[in-house]
Amino acid sequence: MEPAMEPETLEARINRATNPLNKELDWASINGFCEQLNEDFEGPPLATRLLAHKIQSPQEWEAIQALTVLETCMKSCGKRFHDEVGKFRFLNELIKVVSPKYLGSRTSEKVKNKILELLYSWTVGLPEEVKIAEAYQMLKKQGIVKSDPKLPDDTTFPLPPPRPKNVIFEDEEKSKMLARLLKSSHPEDLRAANKLIKEMVQEDQKRMEKISKRVNAIEEVNNNVKLLTEMVMSHSQGGAAAGSSEDLMKELYQRCERMRPTLFRLASDTEDNDEALAEILQANDNLTQVINLYKQLVRGEEVNGDATAGSIPGSTSALLDLSGLDLPPAGTTYPAMPTRPGEQASPEQPSASVSLLDDELMSLGLSDPTPPSGPSLDGTGWNSFQSSDATEPPAPALAQAPSMESRPPAQTSLPASSGLDDLDLLGKTLLQQSLPPESQQVRWEKQQPTPRLTLRDLQNKSSSCSSPSSSATSLLHTVSPEPPRPPQQPVPTELSLASITVPLESIKPSNILPVTVYDQHGFRILFHFARDPLPGRSDVLVVVVSMLSTAPQPIRNIVFQSAVPKVMKVKLQPPSGTELPAFNPIVHPSAITQVLLLANPQKEKVRLRYKLTFTMGDQTYNEMGDVDQFPPPETWGSL
């Protein structure tokens, strides 16, 4: 008896479909590749990696065949594959082939024209994939695309078949199985179809019960929050509170505390519905704020080291001016920050970690890097990676530097939406619940040996200082391409990010949906944007980095670093921890939070590159990526 043949791998199919010895296109292999791509759970990410390698082949015929496979898959493989192609990771590989900086000078015109034709067709046919449109527009700005190519008639994307309106039949696998069973004439198949229909109806009933439970829970939370807020504010304004009112406030407070785990369970059950998650997390934010408000104003307790009513709506003075902690630990291997003029720069690690995204996709709308004003460790137009273990140059050195003429803001703007598919909002649940322990809370009155102005004083003095847009520019390690103007008034030392620390409990989240920065191996990192700006520093965006784990193993030695172009500045405050326990669905999960400050005086479009290292089990991971889904800089003062 012959052994059963093992199914072919995607790699074997792509090798056969793009074989340079093929006399013509092997449509059987191409279609087989597309079909298996759809069937495999990890098909789309693996397929894009294989295709990127084949497209960069020095043999024209092999590259053309690979592009044909890519085009066929885009037309027949659906949204999962579209999402992978629409990521900068894959688009960057296509840009390499057409860019003269990389492989463009060695690539035939036929291959380059085919790539540009595909990019343009996807821009027209898939408008929801905004990153593809961004990449294509960047190529036009760089002059690589002179004019839009003329598309053949068969290039237009066919409209996808409408999904069944009945939610019960939205599970494609079960729908196909049900259709097959119903077509059968065997009694066993008909009984199986009947059983399957009952299961699908029961699943739909459970789904409706979850929706009803979620709606009722959110409504109850909102009502309790509204009532408790009104009573606490009335109490804080000197209103005479009767004993019954105090009892009612206490009862509402206890009810709000009991709703916290309920909201978390709802968020865990609503992972695939972004709008529902946003409602749950907004309700949780409101719940946390009113609980802290009650503790501060009614009980007079300190909330994470802050006895002031920093959560009162409308208060903008809760962000204290705290000096940073930042001394590099012994043995650190991360790139050091740029040094002051006259000091010896520490050797930097090889620049292999800076990928083509720095020059291409991460530099959309930016001109070539401008020469730095002092010795720089990074020649790519980017600041070195910053972490909470790195420190900025001392502020007095900055005060001696003359202000430089700021160049005009870039004309590019952030896309209106980068797609809810890139968002995972679960971590925001723990934004207010996972604050740093008191041992890591920095208090300005205990830390600073010498007097230092607070941000409230800075706000009062802002009229006598130079405007933020011009004075903050001199904090950046860059100069304008034009000759500097004569020295002007020195930059106030308190404008340095080194002297600013924002307590996590004083941050109020904005209505902007969080951005998923990293989501692999059961480890998620999200960016939450603060609602209120720093007093006197509308050029600074406050971001809360939230890290949480659904991995079955504990995660240790977590280090998150960030870097921005030299026209900006970034600072990471110490994280609330460096370890996350193994996920337990019964126990309330913990999270790590870290405050990130981003200065952007010239209001350029933000492009942030991150480096993440962590250990899971016996394996150490070193991850890098980029984030560009930031609010437009013009809106930072009123998010």
Swiss-Prot record:
Cellular component GO terms, alphabetical: cytosol; early endosome; early endosome membrane; endosome membrane; Golgi apparatus; intracellular membrane-bounded organelle; membrane; nucleoplasm
Mutagenesis or variant effect for V570E: Abolishes interaction with CCDC91
Residue ranges constituting the VHS domain according to the UniProt record: 17-147
Domain GAE: 510-631
Tissue localization of expression: Ubiquitously expressed.
Signal peptide (residue range): none
Modified positions (Phosphoserine) in chain numbering: S185, S355, S418
N-acetylmethionine, modified sites: M1
Unstructured hinge as annotated region, ranges: 300-509
Chain segments carrying region Interaction with ARF3: 114-274
Record GO biological process: Golgi to plasma membrane protein transport; Golgi to plasma membrane transport; intracellular protein transport; positive regulation of protein catabolic process; protein catabolic process; protein localization; protein localization to cell surface; protein localization to ciliary membrane
Function field: Plays a role in protein sorting and trafficking between the trans-Golgi network (TGN) and endosomes. Mediates the ARF-dependent recruitment of clathrin to the TGN and binds ubiquitinated proteins and membrane cargo molecules with a cytosolic acidic cluster-dileucine (DXXLL) motif. Mediates export of the GPCR receptor ADRA2B to the cell surface. Required for targeting PKD1:PKD2 complex from the trans-Golgi network to the cilium membrane. Regulates retrograde transport of proteins such as phosphorylated form of BACE1 from endosomes to the trans-Golgi network.
Protein name: ADP-ribosylation factor-binding protein GGA1
